[in-house]
A protein has these predicted regions:
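Hydrophobic helical h-region of N-terminal Sec-dependent signal peptides
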Residues: 6-14
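Short, surface-exposed ligand- or partner-binding patches at beta-edge/loop junctions that are enriched
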Residues: 89
């Protein structure tokens, strides 16, 4: 009886997690898939790391709006057209998921680099340094 109860709980939690992952409203992509997606020049590349991180290396043609700043939503609204897909990246993927959720909530079509800039570098993708 105890086993059945535990299995029921595990199944229920798995279902809830699966529903949450499907309803996030944006797509998380591997470095290869992200590279293919941003090859479309209509896609806007958004790096949500700090200005210092951005200056040390970023994806070509990316613009920088720090998601940790209190004015992120205002800057995004003033800078990013809702008619375009926004491709978001950060260092490891955590901040980009946060930014993607904020942007999606505000009506943007969003994709994000699941492994972040670290994964981009590890995959040997092009990096621009300023």
């Amino acid at each position: 009886m105890k086993k059945i109860f535990i299995m029921s709980i595990i199944t229920m939690l798995s279902s809830l997690y699966s529903c949450q992952a499907q309803n996030k409203g944006y797509k998380s992509l591997s470095a290869d898939d992200y590279e293919k997606a941003i090859a479309d020049t209509a896609v806007i590349r958004l790096d949500v790391r700090t200005a210092e991180e951005f200056a040390n290396g970023h994806i070509r043609c990316a613009i920088n709006i720090d998601v940790l700043k209190s004015n992120f939503e205002q800057k995004a609204a003033a800078t990013l057209p809702k008619s375009k897909t926004i491709a978001v990246n950060c260092r490891s993927g955590k901040r980009s998921k946060n930014a993607a959720a904020i942007l999606t909530k505000n009506g943007y079509q969003v994709i994000e680099l699941d492994s972040g800039f670290i994964g981009w570098q590890a995959a040997g993708k092009e990096i621009i340094k300023e």
